Every structure is written in structure tokens, then in C-alpha cells.
């Protein structure tokens, strides 16, 4: 397996784990108000299981929905829920540049998560697309500002993640162009989820090396 194939496989594995933090983390947070110890134990168990078996959380959720005969567009629902902050990804450094990075990432995710509500209104959706483009630019500008001000030993990892984010941003743009031809909204939802995931990975990478 080539290095590029290994990176692709790793990205796919982490992408399939999105339901853990988008769906289950809010559940754990609610449970903490009732039983802190049980919530922490359950969270740790899910994290461990998901790490060892990427996609397990999604499989569990899908099985529950199937058993309850609940029909839901899981990809769309995931997109709606994926805007929330994830503590494990948020950068804790107090410097303004890092907090600005948190804020810009949050803004982009929130706009992307609104796509299901906007996509059927062409005028509103076109405005949303403009807002997404602006949010992407602002996030990249903030990433570059951090690069300029701070030196990192593991700069290569940061550069790689930035390139991945740009790649998925372009892919999202291409998906939008196709959508206006074929009208398949599900592909837009999938691409938006991937872009949200890459946004989280930017935060995670900075948090790891900062």
C-alpha cells in the first residue's frame, strides 16, 4: 500500500467516525447532568470501541433506527448535527490567533449545517454558497496568520492538513456545480459533511502540535 493510499484509508476511517461526536457526544453531555460517572464511563467505552472499530457507532445508530422502524436521511441528519463544537478538537491556547481559528471553524461548520434548510430555495441557497466561500477564505486566512506568527516543529503535518482542506473545499465546489445539473442533494450533503470533517481535522492538528 502506498503512502497516499494509507492516508486515504486513514481519512476514510476517521470520516466514518463522525457520528460518534456529532450524534453521541451531545447524548453523553445530556447524560452527564443526570449521572456524571455513568456518562464518562459510556463515553470512554464508545471512544475506545470506535477507535478499534471505526464506524461502529454509526452501525449501532443505524441498527437502532432500523429496529424502531424510523426512516431518516442519516447523511442529512448528520450534517444538521455536525456544527456543534467538539471539545476534543477545540484549541485551548488563549492567544487571539488560536481562538480566532476556533471561531472561524465554528462559523464555517454552522453555515454548512444549514444547507438542508436552504437547498430547496434557490435564492437563499445561492447566498449560502457565497457565505460558505467567504467562510472558507476566512478560515484559510486565519490558518496562514497562525503560520506566520508561530513556528512549529511538525509544520509538515499542518501543511498537509491545510492542503487536504483545500482539496475538499474544491471538491465541495465541484459537487455544487454537478448539483445544479442533476439536482441530487444527497451528494451535496455528503460533500458538506466531508468538509466539516476536514475543518475539525485542522483544529485537531493545530491542537496536537501547538
From Swiss-Prot:
There is a cross-link at residue 184 (Glycyl lysine isopeptide (Lys-Gly) (interchain with G-Cter in SUMO2)). The keyword Cytoplasm applies. The modification N6-acetyllysine is found at residue 177. It is a peripheral membrane protein. Keywords: Acetylation, Angiogenesis, Apoptosis, Cell membrane, Cytoplasm, Golgi apparatus, Isopeptide bond, Membrane, Ubl conjugation. GO terms for molecular function: protein homodimerization activity; protein kinase binding. One of its GO terms (biological process) is negative regulation of cell migration involved in sprouting angiogenesis. InterPro entries: PDC10_dimerisation_sf, PDCD10, PDCD10_N. Homodimer. Interacts (via C-terminus) with CCM2. Interacts (via C-terminus) with PXN. Interacts (via N-terminus) with STK25. Interacts (via N-terminus) with STK26. Interacts (via N-terminus) with STK24. Interacts with GOLGA2. Identified in a complex with KRIT1 and CCM2. Interacts with KDR/VEGFR2. Interaction with KDR/VEGFR2 is enhanced by stimulation with VEGFA. Interacts with RIPOR1 (via C-terminus); this interaction is required for the association of RIPOR1 with either STK24 and STK26 kinases and occurs in a Rho-independent manner. This is Programmed cell death protein 10. It comes from Rattus norvegicus. The gene is Pdcd10.
Amino acid at each position: 500500500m502506498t503512502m497516499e493510499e494509507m492516508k486515504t484509508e486513514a481519512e476514510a476511517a476517521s470520516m466514518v467516525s463522525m457520528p460518534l461526536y456529532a450524534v453521541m457526544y451531545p447524548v453523553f453531555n445530556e447524560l452527564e447532568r443526570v449521572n456524571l460517572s455513568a456518562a464518562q464511563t459510556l463515553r470512554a467505552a464508545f471512544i475506545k470501541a470506535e477507535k478499534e472499530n471505526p464506524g461502529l457507532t454509526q452501525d449501532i445508530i443505524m441498527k437502532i433506527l432500523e429496529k424502531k422502524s424510523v426512516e431518516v436521511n442519516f447523511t442529512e441528519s448528520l450534517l444538521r448535527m455536525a456544527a456543534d463544537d467538539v471539545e476534543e478538537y477545540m484549541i485551548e491556547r488563549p492567544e487571539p490567533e488560536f481562538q480566532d481559528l476556533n471561531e472561524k471553524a465554528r462559523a464555517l461548520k454552522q453555515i454548512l449545517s444549514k444547507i438542508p434548510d436552504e437547498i430547496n430555495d434557490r435564492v437563499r441557497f445561492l447566498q449560502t454558497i457565497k457565505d460558505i466561500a467567504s467562510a472558507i477564505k476566512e478560515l484559510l486566512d486565519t490558518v496562514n496568520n497562525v503560520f506566520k506568527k508561530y513556528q512549529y516543529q511538525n509544520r509538515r503535518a499542518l501543511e498537509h492538513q491545510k492542503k487536504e482542506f483545500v482539496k475538499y473545499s474544491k471538491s465541495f465546489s465541484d459537487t455544487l456545480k454537478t448539483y445544479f445539473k442533476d439536482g441530487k442533494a444527497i451528494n451535496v450533503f455528503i460533500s458538506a459533511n466531508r468538509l466539516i470533517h476536514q475543518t475539525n481535522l485542522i483544529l485537531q492538528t493545530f491542537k496536537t502540535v501547538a
